[in-house]
């Protein structure tokens, strides 16, 4: 038995300099697991609650000492002595201890830190790499990365309304070569921006944040960078967007301030369809407001056969909401953010539900990240096929890519890179 003998929660800083929660779990054998949780900037209204202290004079109210105290007292008492290898039972214990629908009492940040740290300790105790512990012998597929090379919206201080403009390398035989492709396009884009006298400062997720005149201009410039790096747009590299449309939906209209547009749901669906016709876009995330299910249905009916439509704020990694979306034919993919739901067991359930329905599952970071690379192991362990973990700069993003390189090396000849086949929802 891998009995838990000590649990330590602490407050650390994330990539934006805001406090977040880290947890150490120690087993009877002396084995330890450590995990740190991320935090989002644009968040869905139905996400599990991230517990913050609200003390204005300390970290602007963003401290997490209450969440840490919950780990070091109530949670510690509840799971001390439990078997770390019994992940589902341990997560159930956490859920029952919290007793709320949205984890507002203990905090999803406290619960997730413990859930992840327990899994890491159990994997170490079993002598298995984390991805293998999660997925067993079937874990062998590396994910296709969606690399956020231009930041807008809530992730940057510029005029772009769409939050993320991503490149998706799909023709490469290995993850290593896909990563190289992304890095080369990133540096080609930096040179283009520099030559134009545009800003090469980066946003929260490591992408550039220049002031483009329009989304169209931004996408055209990315195509130039792909070609400048020696790749073929639409063949070697595809494009993806995260609209984060809930952020610019006001008074029943999609208000693209950067372009001076106010659009109805139908008009915004047409706007996105026009972009998809003009550019090699394979995926659009949060193309409608999280509460605009009629708009989502319009968008799905219009683009759902040829474009991956990812629900992030829409589904918030929640199986109850995802089930409703599947039944109503809304979207065809779910974004998986571990801190939206708060335990690994619930996270894995959302991935499996999506797959059973023919939806894809995209494993994702948050804009406030740490050096913790657990999501890389989840992506491989669950054979998710896709990952979103930022740009080709900032070590909080690169840590996940580097972990995937290590996993691919560890897998050796049995490692596979799915490329375009990762988008099985579009077949």
From Swiss-Prot:
Binding site for Mg(2+): 242, 285, 312
Enzyme Commission number(s): 4.2.1.11
Claim: Transcription is one of the keywords in the record: no
GO MF terms held by the record: magnesium ion binding; phosphopyruvate hydratase activity
Cofactor(s) required for function per UniProt: Mg(2+)
Localization per Swiss-Prot or TrEMBL: Cytoplasm; Secreted; Cell surface
Pathway listed: Carbohydrate degradation; glycolysis; pyruvate from D-glyceraldehyde 3-phosphate: step 4/5
Catalytic activity: (2R)-2-phosphoglycerate = phosphoenolpyruvate + H2O
HAMAP family: Enolase
Described purpose of this protein according to its UniProt entry: Catalyzes the reversible conversion of 2-phosphoglycerate (2-PG) into phosphoenolpyruvate (PEP). It is essential for the degradation of carbohydrates via glycolysis.
Protein name: Enolase
Organism: Paraburkholderia phymatum (strain DSM 17167 / CIP 108236 / LMG 21445 / STM815)
Gene it is expressed from: eno
């Amino acid at each position: 038995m891998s009995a838990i003998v000590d649990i330590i929660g602490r407050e650390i800083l994330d990539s934006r300099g805001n406090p977040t929660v880290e947890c150490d779990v120690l087993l009877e054998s002396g084995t330890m697991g450590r995990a740190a949780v991320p935090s989002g900037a644009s968040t869905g209204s139905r996400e599990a609650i991230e517990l913050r202290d609200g003390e204005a004079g300390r970290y602007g109210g963003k401290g997490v000492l209450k969440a840490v105290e919950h780990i070091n007292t109530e949670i510690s008492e509840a799971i001390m002595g439990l078997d770390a290898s019994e992940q589902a039972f341990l997560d159930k214990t956490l859920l029952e201890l919290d007793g709320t629908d949205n984890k507002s009492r203990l905090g999803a940040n406290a619960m997730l830190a413990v859930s992840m740290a327990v899994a890491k300790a159990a994997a170490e105790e079993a002598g298995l790499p984390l991805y293998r512990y999660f997925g067993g012998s079937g874990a062998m597929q590396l994910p296709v990365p969606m690399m956020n090379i231009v930041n807008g919206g809530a992730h940057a201080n510029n005029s772009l309304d769409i939050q993320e403009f991503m490149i998706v390398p799909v023709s490469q035989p290995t993850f290593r070569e896909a990563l190289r492709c992304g890095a080369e396009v990133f540096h080609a884009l930096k040179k283009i921006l520099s030559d134009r006298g545009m800003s090469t400062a980066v946003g929260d997720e490591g992408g550039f944040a220049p002031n483009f005149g329009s989304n169209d201009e931004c996408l055209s410039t990315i195509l130039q960078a792909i070609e400048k790096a020696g790749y073929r747009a639409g063949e070697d590299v595809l494009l993806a967007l995260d609209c984060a449309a809930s952020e610019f939906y006001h008074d029943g209209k999609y208000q693209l301030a950067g372009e001076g547009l106010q659009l109805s749901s139908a008009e915004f669906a047409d706007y996105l369809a026009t972009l998809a016709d003009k550019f090699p876009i394979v995926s659009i995330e949060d193309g409608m407001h999280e509460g605009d299910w009629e708009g989502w249905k319009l968008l799905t009916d219009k683009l759902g056969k040829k474009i991956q439509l990812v629900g992030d704020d829409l589904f918030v990694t929640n199986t109850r909401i995802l089930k409703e979306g599947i039944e109503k034919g809304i979207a065809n993919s779910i974004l998986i953010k571990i801190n939206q739901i708060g335990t690994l067991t619930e996270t894995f359930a959302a991935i499996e539900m999506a797959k059973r329905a023919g939806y894809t599952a995209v494993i994702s970071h948050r804009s406030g990240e740490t050096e913790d690379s657990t999501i890389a192991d989840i992506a491989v362990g669950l054979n998710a096929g896709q990952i979103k973990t930022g740009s080709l700069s900032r070590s909080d993003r690169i840590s996940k890519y580097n972990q995937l390189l290590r996993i691919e090396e560890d897998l050796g000849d049995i490692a596979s890179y799915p490329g375009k086949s990762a988008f099985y929802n579009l077949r």
